[in-house]
Swiss-Prot record:
GO biological process terms, semicolon-separated: glycine biosynthetic process from serine; tetrahydrofolate interconversion
Cofactors named for this entry: pyridoxal 5'-phosphate
Keyword Transferase attributed: yes
GO CC terms in record: cytosol
This protein's pathway: One-carbon metabolism; tetrahydrofolate interconversion; Amino-acid biosynthesis; glycine biosynthesis; glycine from L-serine: step 1/1
PROSITE patterns: SHMT
Highest taxon above the source species: Bacteria
Entry protein name: Serine hydroxymethyltransferase
Keyword annotations: Amino-acid biosynthesis, Cytoplasm, One-carbon metabolism, Pyridoxal phosphate, Transferase
Amino acid sequence: MKHLPAQDEQVFSAIQDERKRQQSKIELIASENFVSEAVMEAQGSVLTNKYAEGYPGKRYYGGCEHVDVAEDIARDRAKQIFGAEHVNVQPHSGAQANMAVYFTILEHGDTVLGMNLAHGGHLTHGSPVNFSGVQYNFVEYGVDKETQYIDYEDVREKALKHKPKLIVAGASAYPRTIDFKKFREIADEVGAYVMVDMAHIAGLVAAGLHPNPVPYADFVTTTTHKTLRGPRGGMILCREEFAKQIDKSIFPGIQGGPLMHVIAAKAVSFGEALKDEFKTYAQNVINNAKRLAETLKKEGIELVSGGTDNHLVLVDLRSLGITGKVAENVLDEVGITVNKNAIPYDPEKPFVTSGIRVGTAAVTSRGFDLEAIEEVGAIIALALKNHEDEAKLEEAKQRVEALTNRFPLYTGLDY
């Protein structure tokens, strides 16, 4: 960085500190990843200066001919990756992508079927503290109490009983493969639309390692970060018949000017996702998650549903006698970043929880292999089982430092 250190020392210092944190800690938050330096360069470009309300070729401002190119590239690449008929890359976030779909097909008070937040759903899938739960009549489905897999019969029974206008599939903390075909079949029985929120698994879908929801859903929403490894933002994929309505719901419906520098960064990351190297990366993400799950189970730690099919593992801490809040703090102390997370049928409050969610997208981007991820699992077990033993926690800290030194991050940056 050439100008920021001299112009604004306080902000530069915060950026430096965050850079050091990312280097010195092991990032296991399942919704985070490390983008390429090319993505960061696009996002930090002169495109940040350009207002571009509207869509390519139909803008409300002049001088958009070059940002139009960037947006067209992003849309075309996303179509190619996922086989979608129409793509909107303007949503600022996954939540706004979901909002746009709701505003497109729902009226206030309409019935929607969505996954219970504590069972792995998302705030925007009907939580009473979110606009979705306030605006619409959400009926919740969840996972089977024994298997902790989605109970598709429960989904069907509730659909038949409540006749929802929309069924939402997808999750923020569900470690198993979702059967989108089954959701489509249930929706067809009751004449409902299907929206799939694939925010967490989009990168795995892009690599052909998770079933693609596009053939089964009327609408697919996603973030562009997480496993897709792009900038923070959202995206909507839909059938051509809904294209104009979706575009109107985004602009002028719920957003004004799109963030053209972010859209350019999305385009760069989509280009990366089309390469063979990305498929290898995504396979390694899954391999690492499975190995992490196996390691934790060998250490006697319980996992929701017994394991994982994707990039994340949901840990049930009750047998260890600690809460998710305590575990998050203990692991942060030794240099491992996770988030506390509710587990199905959780007796604890949402800010306390009985679980933690861990994911392998970021550490895999950093280069962690199976041997390294086994060591991560062993360190987690050591810290959680000995969370009040300062000597053991110091040992865990040193082992984390050895790993982070072995896998440096962003060596080309000058700050």
